[in-house]
Every structure is written in structure tokens, then in C-alpha cells.
């Protein structure tokens, strides 16, 4: 949500979750964090999984070039293969992926470029450190990271997080929590 708020809240996003239950919990969390967008359209965020009849009914709208909603789809397996998600600009990995084939299929959801429709790139947000398992520099080329990207830099002056609108506030350094897979963990609610 923070990334979408700092870039484009209407960019098509797929969140890959560990299970259908996880996809439902993620959908609820994203609805809570994006309640203003959900008020505009209740289908801003939907779960699209094999057992979700309502979500599956929204699949054609999600993959459509001309339909703005749904914007965020949470899923476990259904969107991994076979869905031509033409306008997906953000792929979020919140599940462990151990198969190179599955990984490439998931990433493939974002690779469709449609310059005439405004789709020139896509972003992978990896919360499980999956991308390091499938690093193939000979095939993929060097990893591009925007070193100039500053989280929250587009927030309005005098925002709720302090700072002057140009520079982030002087927050005390937090000691990161690292899980067994080496991923940094951020607790957002206790």
C-alpha cells in the first residue's frame, strides 16, 4: 500500500500468497489499508482463487486493458499460469516459491509491455526473498535498482510522518528483525 500510495494507486497489482486462506487475510488487510479506494469502488481489491466464485467472476475485469477495477488481486495459485494479465505493473511475492518454472510463470504476469496503453515496465516486490534463489545474471542481465528512490518522497509537505516534504524525518534507526530465510521483517501491528 505504501508503494502504491507513493507511485500510482490504480496500477494493476497481483499479490501471490501462500494459500487461499492467506490470500483472504491479505485481501482484508489491503482493504483496511486502502479504505478510501474501496469506498470509491468495493472491487478495488479482490481475492481471485480457485474456490472464490465472486473473485473468479472478476478475473476478466482484472485482466482487461480497459477496465480499471479490480486493481489489486490477491491469489495463491490461480493467477500463476494461463492468465494474460496485460496491465499488471506490480507483482508482490508473499509466498515461498521453490520451482524455477513456477517463479518464471509468476513473473511472466508482469512482462507484457503495452506502450500504447501506458504499460512500459513492471515491478517485483519480494517479501520472501524468492528472487535470490532464481538469480540468473547470464539470462536476466544485471538487476536494476533505483538507488535514488526514497520511500515517501512524494508525500505532501508537512505530512503525518514529519519531515519538511523534501527530506524524510529524522527517525531513530530501528534494529531489523530477520527471519530464518534471511528476510527482513517489519511488524506493522502488535
Model-derived features with residue positions:
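Conserved helicase/translocase motor-coupling segment
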Residues: 1-37
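A sequence-composition feature that detects small, non-aromatic residues
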Residues: 2, 18, 23, 29, ...
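Generic detector of leucine side chains in alpha-helical contexts
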Residues: 4, 10, 26, 30, ...
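Short coil/turn helix-boundary motifs
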Residues: 6-7, 66, 181
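Intrinsically disordered, low-complexity boundary segments flanking structured domains
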Residues: 31-36, 109-115, 164-165, 171-174
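Detector for Asparagine
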Residues: 32-34, 41, 129, 167, ...
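Conserved RecA-like P-loop NTPase helicase motor core
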Residues: 38-40, 44-153
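Long, largely alpha-helical accessory region at the distal end of helicase-like NTP-driven motors
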Residues: 131-190
